[in-house]
A protein has these predicted regions:
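Short, flexible/disordered intra-domain loops and linkers
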Residues: 42-58, 103-108, 162-169
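C-lobe/activation-segment region of protein kinase-like
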Residues: 132-133, 145-226
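Protein kinase-like catalytic core scaffold
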Residues: 32, 75, 89, 150-151
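Conserved structural core of kinase catalytic domains
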Residues: 56-62, 71-117
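Hydrophobic residue at the +6 position relative to the catalytic HRD Asp in the kinase catalytic loop
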Residues: 137-144
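AlphaC helix (C-helix) of the protein kinase catalytic domain N-lobe
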Residues: 63, 67-68, 124
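ATP-binding glycine-rich loop module of kinase domains
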Residues: 6-64
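Protein kinase catalytic-loop region centered on the HRD/HxD motif
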Residues: 122-132
Length: 226
């Protein structure tokens, strides 16, 4: 099977890398997505941010830890293969990601999947029920397979039993535009950038920062989840 780099075609920006951590690959028949935990300079267009090998290894280990726990739940895509030597995860998909199918525009989400809000809420609630805090919540972190959302990108996920972290600890893999959105809410939420914060407060900041990617009513629904 042949693979190629996978990008999101963002209006006004053109082809953009799919994430800041790994190198995204897709099969030419658009049926397999590969998370390749490798710092590929060509794919990242010289804008590599996670260049510390230890950090990359940690992200790989988190991805494997969490996504393998979802096998059989229907929450994540089917894992076709894991190559620990190459640090690759092969996932069964059915075309481009949710955001890409919507033309990278939240106005089109309903046309891709009319009940996307309910489906995404159910996935987020399932994470909460497991005591997980997942911060890679961009709409490109979902694929649609047989009419069902499938969640990926667990490299930015923590258990509520883990020590708290600060934003500064993880800013290397947060887009600068996302950081700008986060800074708008620091004072309101009483958050200091370089000090560890309670997980629930970090959850709230995360969702406040996604106001340009999701409708306001959806974000309010998420914030009400217990």
């Amino acid at each position: 099977m042949n693979y190629e780099y996978y990008y999101n075609n963002v209006p006004g920006q053109g082809l953009c890398r799919n994430n800041l951590i790994y190198t995204s690959l897709i099969s030419t028949d658009k049926k397999v997505f590969v998370q390749w935990y490798h710092n590929d300079t060509e794919y990242h267009q010289g804008k590599n941010q996670v260049v510390d090998p230890k950090k990359m290894q940690e992200k790989w280990e988190r991805e494997i830890l969490f996504i393998q726990q979802l096998v059989g739940t229907g929450i994540a895509p089917k894992i076709l293969k894991v190559d620990p030597r190459e640090r690759k995860i092969f996932l069964a998909i059915d075309g481009p990601d949710f955001w890409e199918q919507a033309g990278c525009d939240q106005a089109n989400y309903n046309s891709v999947l009319p009940d996307w809000q309910d489906q995404m809420i159910n996935i987020i609630k399932a994470h909460k029920d497991r005591g997980w805090h997942k911060y890679s919540m961009h709409p490109s972190s979902y694929f649609v397979v047989d009419g069902k959302l499938k969640s990926i990108n667990y490299f930015f996920t923590y258990r509520d039993t883990e020590p708290n972290i600060s934003i500064a600890d993880v800013e290397s893999h947060i887009y600068t535009t996302r950081q700008d959105e986060m800074r708008k809410h620091l004072n309101t939420l009483g958050i200091e950038w370089d000090k560890p914060q309670p997980w629930l407060l970090m959850d709230q900041l995360c969702w406040e920062s996604f106001s340009t990617n999701y409708p306001a009513e959806f974000i309010e629904r998420v914030k009400c989840l217990k």
